[in-house]
Amino acid sequence: MISNIFIFIICYLFISLSVIGYGLIFFSFNKNLKISLNFGYAGLTGLLMLCIYSYFSSFFYEHGSTHNLILIFIGFAYFVFFNLKKIDYHFKVISLFLLIYFVGILIYKSHDDFPYYHFQYTYYLTQMPSVIGIGNFNLGFRTPSSIFYLNSLFYLPIIKFYMFQMAAFLIFLYSNVILISKLIQDNINKKYNFLTFYYLLSFIFINIFFSRVSEHGTDRSAQILILILIGEILSFVNFKVKIEKHLSKLFLLIALIISLKAFYVLYIIFFSIILYKLVNSYK
């Protein structure tokens, strides 16, 4: 029992830090791509990178345990390399949240859709390449989501499929890191405005109503990201910000939200607000 929990903790840290590592790898390509020092945004960026990779790679080969182990190790190694010579404020924040939120991944009962098609879809991606027409076997297979493809990358040796809720948990974790980092930064700078209260209320709301990760399907993860997206849009519209980096944050959040469930493409309306702001800024 103790050995199983120890293995679970190791995999939990291994995956969580590896995803951040992939976000940092993306940031390292060009300084203009570094949208934030916040490890929460690095984590979300890493999720998007892995999501894109998993979609394309699934057509050519299965996401087996050996493949996934190598993939996750690369991200983890970069994260360790990145933080080898410095332990800054952002590292302390992510370490604290990893410690506090560990209990969130200890799931006793999953939500109703998980045994219906979430598990089957994810597990099938680990056993064979993606096949066109699989939706004829189960209606659930006709509604793909990035969360299934992400979870298929967390199928590792020994732990096997017991990390198939990890993608939803990571969105929950990184979103909380983003919110609390913004609150801490406002407190350090002694600059309080309506967004400070918005982020505080969002943090409280997420941790009360979305605290049960076992109930997270594709909807709730997207709803958490929508709360952050609204905050970033309000910041973009009402305050002077670096347009390029802020736009990158908005595109990142919108891309993740739409990838989780197709009907969230309706949130494309937010682009009209962004374009309106851009037009006015260049007048």
Language-model features, listed with the residues they occupy:
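Membrane-embedded, hydrophobic transmembrane alpha-helices
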Residues: 1-87
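Transmembrane signal-anchor helices characteristic of membrane glycosylation enzymes that use polyprenol
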Residues: 11, 78, 90-113, 204-207
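Membrane-interface helix caps and helix-loop-helix hairpins in membrane proteins
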Residues: 55-63, 108-111, 208-218
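Membrane-interface alpha helices of multi-pass inner-membrane proteins
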Residues: 58, 210, 246-262, 266-273
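Multi-pass, polyprenyl lipid-linked donor-dependent membrane glycosyltransferases
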Residues: 66-67, 167, 208-235
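Perimembrane helix-loop-helix junctions
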Residues: 75-87, 267-283
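Active-site lumenal/periplasmic loops and adjacent helix-entry segments of GT-C-fold
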Residues: 102-195, 213-215
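Membrane-interface transmembrane helices that cradle and orient dolichyl/undecaprenyl
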Residues: 188-190, 226-246
